[in-house]
């Protein structure tokens, strides 16, 4: 993996990072790296995320999924970090893009349509919740379990559970003697893609989880006390410096359909980790080349508050374009889709500094297990670095907890400080049939 920061320098873009300040930034990286390494060595909460590879045993995961290894598809019941890592990996690497479906929302229509479209006898259940009490996850699991029972499928023979040492989900797993894997200690869910939390569906679908871990290890080995020597830290340092310069939106734009969910995973990682104390880049999601025809207009000509992060594989499978039968399409003769998307990538990246707007480029070798594992670990490390540079509590999410507490209180009919805010919030409804 390599990172190109040239289009984010002040000589190319505004906002941008002055080349003369890179050495000062590098000194900050060295200090932050030392603090990160101290946290890793002590196994401190959150910093233990970067030690996850050492604690993840692929053989244990293979053993747990063995009873469902014949499944043709997997349904993951989880939310946030309990689902997005697995979704990103399987979308990037599974032979059948529809073989992994995710229930990470409680929209009843979506849940119903998803279950109606599956052959449950051929589908494994992967349920993930650290606490075992996550409302959305447990509600969806109960619905899924009933669907299996209604179709005469023994759900206890088609399930793998990943959860903590206590809680209702752990009790259920113990009661039915279900295959169970632990959620790693000291690791927030959004940093757990390269653990059982993210690796169960790939393992069931025959994806090379050892390769994913090896790729993550490569990114770990590349961490160094200098942005000039570490692609992950180069990305994190530049993202931090660009936010300081005014780029408060980070639009992630992969040029590979199979990396579309990577943008979703990155959005949670970046927003939940760094959105603290009135700061943090807002992650946006785009897809190349599709969004050249929509969002690119904003990125080149809208507010100067954005950096676009381009992600692409250097090598990719190809499809030849048949010779056209119209002279206006003759420029496509002898070309292929890979050449076309690469040309669009180069043109779009160049279009941003041409409009005096910043861009960062992340290039992986190819869409294989090693490269995807390397990308995920590198972005996690970059996020940890940004948190250190910005001096925020990277591994907590207090603003998220407010909504969780309020939801539970509403469901239980309890009166709490949160429900009082809900009851008293100002409303001005337009379109009401009764007079305001």
From Swiss-Prot:
Named in its record, the pathway it takes part in is: Carbohydrate biosynthesis; gluconeogenesis; Carbohydrate degradation; glycolysis; D-glyceraldehyde 3-phosphate and glycerone phosphate from D-glucose: step 2/4
The gene designation is pgi
What the entry lists under InterPro entries is as follows: G6P_Isomerase, Phosphoglucose_isomerase_CS, SIS_dom_sf, SIS_PGI_1, SIS_PGI_2
| E.C. no | 5.3.1.9
The cellular component terms of Gene Ontology attached to this UniProt record, alphabetical and capped at eight, are:
cytosol
Predominant location of this chain?
cytoplasm
What does this gene product do?
Answer: Catalyzes the reversible isomerization of glucose-6-phosphate to fructose-6-phosphate.
Q: Name one Pfam family in it.
A: PGI
- Protein name per Swiss-Prot or TrEMBL: Probable glucose-6-phosphate isomerase
> What family is reported?
Belongs to the GPI family.
Originating organism: Haloarcula marismortui (strain ATCC 43049 / DSM 3752 / JCM 8966 / VKM B-1809)
């Amino acid at each position: 993996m390599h990172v190109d920061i040239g289009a984010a320098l002040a000589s190319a873009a505004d906002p941008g990072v002055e080349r003369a300040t890179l050495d000062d930034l590098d000194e900050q990286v060295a200090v932050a790296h030392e603090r990160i390494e101290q946290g890793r060595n002590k196994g401190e909460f959150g910093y233990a995320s970067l030690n996850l590879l050492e604690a993840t045993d692929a053989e244990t995961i293979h053993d747990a999924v063995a009873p469902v290894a014949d499944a043709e598809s997997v349904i993951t019941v989880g939310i946030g970090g309990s689902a997005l890592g697995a979704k990103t990996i399987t979308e990037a690497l599974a032979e059948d893009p529809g073989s992994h479906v995710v229930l990470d929302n409680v929209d009843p229509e979506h849940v119903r349509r998803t279950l109606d479209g599956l052959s449950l006898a051929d589908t494994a259940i992967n349920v993930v919740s650290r606490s075992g009490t996550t409302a959305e996850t447990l509600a969806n699991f109960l619905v899924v379990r009933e669907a299996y029972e209604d179709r005469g499928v023994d759900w206890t023979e088609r399930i793998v559970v990943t959860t903590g040492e206590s809680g209702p989900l752990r009790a259920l797993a113990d009661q039915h003697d279900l295959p169970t894997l632990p959620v790693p200690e000291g690791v927030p869910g959004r940093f757990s893609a390269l653990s059982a939390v993210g690796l169960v569906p790939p393992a069931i679908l025959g994806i090379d989880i050892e390769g994913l871990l090896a790729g993550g290890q490569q990114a770990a080995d590349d961490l160094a006390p200098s942005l000039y020597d570490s692609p992950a830290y180069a990305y994190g340092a530049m993202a931090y410096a660009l936010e300081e310069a005014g780029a408060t939106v980070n639009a992630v734009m992969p040029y590979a359909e199979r990396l579309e969910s990577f943008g979703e995973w990155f959005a949670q990682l970046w927003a939940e980790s760094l959105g603290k104390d009135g700061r943090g880049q807002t992650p946006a999601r785009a897809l190349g080349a599709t969004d050249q025809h929509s969002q690119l207009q904003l990125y080149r000509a809208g507010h100067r508050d954005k950096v676009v992060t381009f992600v692409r594989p250097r090598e990719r499978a190809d499809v030849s374009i048949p010779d056209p039968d119209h002279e206006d399409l003759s420029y496509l003769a002898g070309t292929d889709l890979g050449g076309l998307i690469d040309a669009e990538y180069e043109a779009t990246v160049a279009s941003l500094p041409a409009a005096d707007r910043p861009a960062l480029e992340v290039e992986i070798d190819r869409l294989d297990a090693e490269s995807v594992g390397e990308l995920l670990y590198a972005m996690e490390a970059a996020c940890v670095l940004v948190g250190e540079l910005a001096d925020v509590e990277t591994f907590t999410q207090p603003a998220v907890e407010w909504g969780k507490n309020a939801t539970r209180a509403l469901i239980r009919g309890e009166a709490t400080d949160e429900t009082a805010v809900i009851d008293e919030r100002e409303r001005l409804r337009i379109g009401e049939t009764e007079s305001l």
